[in-house]
């Protein structure tokens, strides 16, 4: 008689959704987090001062530059970067704990952070790049935010640099219609979750049948 399949034992994964500013990444990731209890947002460590309403361990882990540098030197950060004079990074411990418990972690990083995560956690990172339908459409979205022309020009230049790395991601989603883009990202996440290599229970289950992977 066939042994029943266990319902637990899957290793978690790291989901990176990268995109140029204005492509809709925040809208997509907010929707995923709201509907999926198995997906949690990675909490970064930063050297910037807390803003009003921000809580330690909820929005960020706030550290001095000296503390941050020590964490990086000791290998406690999966990835890190310096942005506008402040340091940001991903603490290793909480992510590894989540993965071992079968939870999936969503990261708000750029293409450089994606590569650092892949190096630190080979086999655990799924990368999706979100594109706008066109650069003209992206410019229109940025204009709709009410940004000043010089800010829009800066963001468009940064977008071109970011888009140049789209080929380094295994998945790409074009955000023409937001609900469809959300559904595509959801489908990719589901497929990644069901990969054979993530099913920690499988070897034991097959062993009970006298089989092996």
Swiss-Prot record:
GO terms for cellular component: cytosol. It catalyses: GMP + ATP = GDP + ADP. It is found in: Cytoplasm. InterPro entries: GK/Ca_channel_bsu (IPR008145), Guanylate_kin-like_dom (IPR008144), Guanylate_kinase (IPR017665), Guanylate_kinase_CS (IPR020590), P-loop_NTPase (IPR027417). Its EC number is 2.7.4.8. Residues 12-190 form the Guanylate kinase-like domain. GO terms for molecular function: ATP binding; guanylate kinase activity. It comes from the Bacteria. Keywords: ATP-binding, Cytoplasm, Kinase, Nucleotide-binding, Transferase. ATP binds at residues 19-26. Coiled coil: none annotated. PANTHER family: GUANYLATE KINASE, GUANYLATE KINASE-RELATED. Belongs to the guanylate kinase family. Essential for recycling GMP and indirectly, cGMP. NCBIfam families: guanyl_kin. This is Guanylate kinase. The gene is gmk.
